[in-house]
C-alpha cells in the first residue's frame, strides 16, 4: 500500500507540503512579524483541512477534466465549468468559484481576472490530475487517502502514542483495513484503483533505471493487487510468465492481462513456488515480525539461486526538507493509521529484515525521490 508514488512524475505531490503551508501562512506571517503576534499565523494552520477538501470536491465535480477537454490552454469561468456539470442549482457557479479560487491561490490552478470575472486553467500542478492517454493520473491516490474511512482513522492516531499496540483503523472500524476492504466494496475499489495507478506511474520510472527484469523467465507478484504491476512488467518483458498472487476478494476484481495468471491465496500461509518473487509496497504494510514471516515464506518458495525483488520508498538515514524524506514520511504516517505495525524503513532496516528471513545478500537500486528497488538473494551472487 502506498500513496506517495505519484510524486515521481507529478509536482503537485512533491510540493504539496509547501503549498499547504504557504497557503496557511502567506497572508499572515508578515503581519505577525510586524506586530509581534504569533497566534495570527497559527490561524492558517487551523484551516489546513480546507485545501485537500476543496481539491477533492473539484475532482468529484470533474473540474480538471472539464478544463482539459476545452483545450490545452483553455481558461474557463465558473459558469463555463458548471455548464458541463449535471446540476440545476442556480448558485452553482458562485459556489464553485469559491472552491476554485482557493485552488488558484494555492497554485493548483492558474487563475486570471477578466472584465467578466475570474477564469481558471490547468497548470503544471493540475495537469497531473487529468488522465493521460493511458488513463493514468494521481486522482485515484487522492481519492483513496481522503476517503472517509481513511480520514476517520486519523482521529485515533494519538492513541498510538498513548497506548501500546493500538491500530487507529482497527479502533475506528472494529476490524483491520484488509478485512474492511473485503466487506466494503467502495473502499476495496478505491484502494485497488489507487494502487493500480500508482504502480503504472512507478514502473515508468523503475524501467528507466532497473534492468533486473530483462533476464527473468518467471515472476510471482506476492500481494500484487489486481495485477497492474505485473501487467506492466510483462508488457515490457513479454518473455516473463507472470503469476499474480493475492487474496480472493482482490483477485475477484482483477481484469485479465496477457501473460498474467491470477492465483488466490494468503502470503502469511504460504507462497507459490517461483523462480523469482516481487514484493511491491507490501513490507511497509506490516511490522517486522510479519514482514519476516512473509519473507521466510518467499525464501521457502524460491530455488537456491532465487531472488525477491522489493520495491518500496526508503527513509534516508538523515531526514531533510526534500522530496526524498517527504515521500517516505507521508506514507509512514498512513501506515501508522491503517496497518498493524506498518512503517517505512531505511536501507539498514530492510537489510535486517532480509537477513532475519535467511537471505544471504541484499542489493539496493535507487530510482527517484526515495523510491528504491531492492534485491534479496537467497545465496551470495
Swiss-Prot record:
Q: Which gene encodes it?
A: SMT
InterPro entries in alphabetical order? COMT-like, O_MeTrfase_dom, Plant_O-MeTrfase_dimerisation, SAM-dependent_MTases_sf, WH-like_DNA-bd_sf, WH_DNA-bd_sf
Please name the GO terms of the biological process aspect recorded for this protein, alphabetically. Answer: methylation
Q: Does the keyword Transcription regulation apply?
A: no
Record's protein name: (S)-scoulerine 9-O-methyltransferase
Annotated keywords: Methyltransferase, S-adenosyl-L-methionine, Transferase
State the similarity comment: Belongs to the class I-like SAM-binding methyltransferase superfamily. Cation-independent O-methyltransferase family. COMT subfamily.
Q: What is its EC number?
A: 2.1.1.117
Its function? Produces a precursor of protoberberine alkaloids.
Q: What is the lineage of its organism?
A: Eukaryota, Viridiplantae, Streptophyta, Embryophyta, Tracheophyta
Q: Could you state a single Gene Ontology molecular function term?
A: (S)-scoulerine 9-O-methyltransferase activity
Q: Which residues bind S-adenosyl-L-methionine?
A: 223, 246, 266-267, 280
Reaction(s) this enzyme catalyzes, per UniProt? (S)-scoulerine + S-adenosyl-L-methionine = (S)-tetrahydrocolumbamine + S-adenosyl-L-homocysteine + H(+)
The reply to whether Transferase figures as a keyword in the UniProt entry is yes
Q: Which residues form the active site?
A: 284
Q: Which domain of life is it from?
A: Eukaryota
Amino acid at each position: 500500500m502506498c500513496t506517495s508514488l505519484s510524486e515521481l512524475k507529478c509536482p503537485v505531490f512533491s510540493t504539496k507540503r509547501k503549498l499547504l503551508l504557504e497557503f496557511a501562512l502567506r497572508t499572515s506571517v508578515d503581519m505577525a512579524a510586524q506586530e509581534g503576534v504569533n497566534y495570527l499565523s497559527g490561524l492558517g494552520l487551523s484551516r489546513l483541512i480546507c485545501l485537500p477538501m476543496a481539491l477533492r470536491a473539484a475532482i468529484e465535480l470533474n473540474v480538471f477534466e472539464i478544463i482539459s477537454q476545452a483545450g490545452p490552454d483553455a481558461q474557463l469561468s465558473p459558469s463555463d465549468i458548471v455548464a458541463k456539470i449535471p446540476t440545476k442549482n442556480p448558485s452553482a457557479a458562485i459556489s464553485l468559484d469559491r472552491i476554485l479560487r482557493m485552488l488558484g491561490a494555492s497554485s493548483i490552478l492558474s487563475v486570471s481576472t477578466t472584465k467578466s470575472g475570474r477564469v481558471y486553467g490547468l497548470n503544471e500542478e493540475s495537469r497531473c490530475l487529468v488522465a493521460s492517454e493511458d488513463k493514468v493520473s494521481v486522482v485515484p491516490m487522492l481519492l483513496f487517502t481522503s476517503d472517509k474511512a481513511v480520514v476517520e482513522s486519523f482521529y485515533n492516531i494519538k492513541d498510538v502514542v498513548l497506548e501500546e499496540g493500538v491500530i487507529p483503523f482497527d479502533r475506528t472500524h472494529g476490524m483491520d483495513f484488509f478485512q474492511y476492504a473485503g466487506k466494503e466494496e467502495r473502499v476495496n475499489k478505491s484502494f485497488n484503483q489507487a494502487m493500480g495507478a500508482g504502480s503504472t506511474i512507478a514502473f515508468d520510472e523503475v524501467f528507466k533505471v532497473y534492468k533486473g527484469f530483462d533476464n527473468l523467465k518467471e515472476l510471482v507478484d506476492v500481494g500484487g493487487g489486481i495485477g497492474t504491476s505485473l501487467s506492466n512488467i510483462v508488457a515490457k518483458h513479454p518473455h516473463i510468465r507472470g503469476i499474480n498472487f493475492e487474496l480472493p476478494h482482490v483477485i475477484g476484481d482483477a481484469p485479465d492481462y496477457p501473460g498474467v495468471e491470477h492465483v488466490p491465496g494468503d502470503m502469511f500461509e504460504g507462497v507459490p513456488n517461483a523462480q523469482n518473487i516481487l514484493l511491491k509496497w507490501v513490507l511497509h504494510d506490516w511490522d517486522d515480525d510479519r514482514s519476516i514471516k512473509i519473507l521466510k515464506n518467499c525464501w521457502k518458495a524460491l530455488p537456491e539461486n532465487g531472488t525477491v525483488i522489493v520495491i518500496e520508498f526508503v527513509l534516508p538515514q538523515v531526514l531533510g526538507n526534500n522530496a526524498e524524506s517527504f515521500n517516505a514520511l507521508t506514507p509512514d504516517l498512513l501506515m501508522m493509521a491503517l496497518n498493524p505495525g506498518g512503517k517505512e524503513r531505511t536501507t539498514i532496516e530492510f537489510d535486517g529484515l532480509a537477513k532475519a528471513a535467511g537471505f544471504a545478500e541484499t542489493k539496493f537500486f535507487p530510482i527517484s525521490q526515495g523510491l528504491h528497488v531492492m534485491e534479496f538473494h537467497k545465496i551470495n551472487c
